[in-house]
Curated annotation (Swiss-Prot):
PROSITE patterns reported for this sequence: RIBOSOMAL_S15 (PS00362)
Protein name in UniProt: Small ribosomal subunit protein uS15c
Taxonomic lineage of the native organism: Eukaryota, Viridiplantae, Streptophyta, Embryophyta, Tracheophyta
Subcellular compartments: Plastid, Chloroplast
Family: Belongs to the universal ribosomal protein uS15 family.
Length: 92
């Protein structure tokens, strides 16, 4: 529950800036919220295959956005993954 409340605080901070709704950080935060909600849903409903597919699609979108942010601004990327408590993407 601590993670979810922390995510909500970050989300509210991002939401205060109405101009930044299209920013990469805001999109990653909103995808992370959706991922956490779907993950808790799938713990109860293991055979909900449509939700599993939706989760994989959202994970891919977030991964692509994080890769973009990593290339464009490494400092903002590091700060964001630190705030959201998510792992850094693997490099080849």
């Amino acid at each position: 529950m601590v993670k979810n409340s922390f995510i909500s605080i970050i989300f509210q901070e991002q939401e205060e800036n109405k101009e930044n709704r299209g920013s990469v950080e805001f999109q990653v935060v909103s995808f992370t919220n959706k991922i956490r909600k779907l993950t808790s849903h799938l713990e109860l409903h293991k055979k909900d295959y449509l939700s599993q597919r939706g989760l994989r699609k959202i994970l891919g979108k977030r991964q692509r956005l994080l890769a973009y942010l990593s290339k464009k601004n490494r400092a903002r990327y590091k700060e964001l993954i630190g705030q959201l408590n998510i792992r850094e993407r693997k490099t080849r």
